[in-house]
Regions:
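Ribonuclease/tRNase effector modules and their secretory precursors
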Residues: 1-92
């Protein structure tokens, strides 16, 4: 699976509010967009870019949902989750 970076993007109003509410910094989003650990297609025109990270002894994912069928791409929302096994797709 090719992992593409996204350089040119905007944050939707919804994304701005959710990032603030969830305590996620825009720099974290930019890091995932530039160098995602994994890209999954959700539906035509929408992808999730995600990367694993460690906090203490717990492994998490930061997932960024992006509409790529427009220019610039639009970050719809982002969130952290400890449910790595549910969302991470191992390469076979």
């Amino acid at each position: 699976m090719a992992v593409d970076s996204i350089i040119d993007y905007i944050l939707t109003d919804h994304a701005v509010g959710e990032l603030r509410r969830r305590g996620i910094r825009q720099q974290e989003i930019e890091g995932i967009l530039k160098n995602p650990g994994q890209r999954l297609d959700l539906r035509p025109g929408r992808v999730v870019l995600q990367s694993k990270f460690q906090e203490g002894e717990t492994e998490y994912l930061l997932r960024v949902i992006v509409d790529i069928d427009r220019s610039p791409a639009e970050v719809v929302t982002a969130y952290r989750t400890s449910k790595v096994a549910k969302y991470w797709r191992e390469q076979v």
